[in-house]
Amino acid sequence: MAVLQWKLSRVIFVLLIIGISSFLIYFQFGNSFSASPALERLQDVFSKPSVQEYDYLVPLDEDMQGLSTTYHQATINEDDPQEPKSHEIVILLASDGRSSGNMAPETFNQCIENRINYAKHHNYGFEYVNVSQMNIPPVWAKMPAIIQTMNKHPHAKWIWWLDQDALILNTELSIQEHILSPDVLVEKLMKNEPMISPFSADLERLTPSSYTVDSARSLGLLISQDLNGLNAGSFFVRRSPMMALFLDLWGDKSFRENKVADHEQALLGYFVRYHPEIAAIIGILPQTLINSYPVGQPEMGWKEGHLVIHFAGCWVENRCQVLWDEYRERVH
């Protein structure tokens, strides 16, 4: 049954993409809309010959590929009893190779070290993609970087995107027992939760009232949200052709050139508001599970034992370096 549902979801998703493309071209942008090559290639994604039917991914165009470095290659262990197995999880960082938030240059290397230590401890992969040669803003480069990582790691089942201005603090927590193990995921997913979006003033879209292990397998994006909506500083993407197609759409330049949304997070909110089929593949996790902030209300603020702290917005008060140094001392 789960396999049948997965196949049906792929068919529905392809039809959805065609519908979205038609809607954007005809109704929203009219004659001023200039379709990008990515949109024109959507129909070809599933027409390519595939040696392995379920995991073939179309390679990115060369101008959308960054310099990729595997800082830790997980050891494949088919006897690993966990689901997913540790070597099936890849942590991903992509940036222009510089420090963020006006922090000292050495914080970039400290970030790399933080990810390497965690990946080694749990036998996860860790990939870094330098996107400096891409002619797009870094926040929009995360989508092609994820696809590139999917292609480089065909054994992976999940890619964990984590922003550069975040630290893994509790290195003893494994991703499986904390989030991705099927039973744990069903328990942690937020039910009947409004999906916050800057486009949703006239509509409250809720997450399902319940999940089963089978229904959770249909989710392709696991993310948290704050008061402003879905936050793309820390999220998990299932490696699949369907999600590669979604990422291709999410990163399409037509959306930013035609100012549909100010940034990639807002565009995700646009999809949630206007495309229920996309909303249906998104699972909402409690923010403090994967994306705690240094300050904030109890449902978003960091507490001892949390997996991650994300210094989102630290630049507003020019406190990025102070916070980084303070919490780096708490890594354990």
Curated annotation (Swiss-Prot):
The chain crosses the membrane at residues 11-31. It is a single-pass type II membrane protein. GO terms for molecular function: alpha-1,2-galactosyltransferase activity. Gene3D superfamilies: Spore Coat Polysaccharide Biosynthesis Protein SpsA, Chain A. One of its GO terms (biological process) is protein N-linked glycosylation via asparagine. It comes from the Eukaryota. Residues 1-10 are cytoplasmic. It is found in: Golgi apparatus membrane. It holds the Pfam family Glyco_transf_34. Glycans are attached at N130. Keywords: Glycoprotein, Glycosyltransferase, Golgi apparatus, Membrane, Signal-anchor, Transferase, Transmembrane, Transmembrane helix. Its EC number is 2.4.1.-. Residues 32-332 are lumenal. GO terms for cellular component: Golgi membrane. Belongs to the glycosyltransferase 34 family. Involved in the galactosylation of the N-linked core oligosaccharide Man(9)GlcNAc(2). This is Alpha-1,2-galactosyltransferase gmh3.
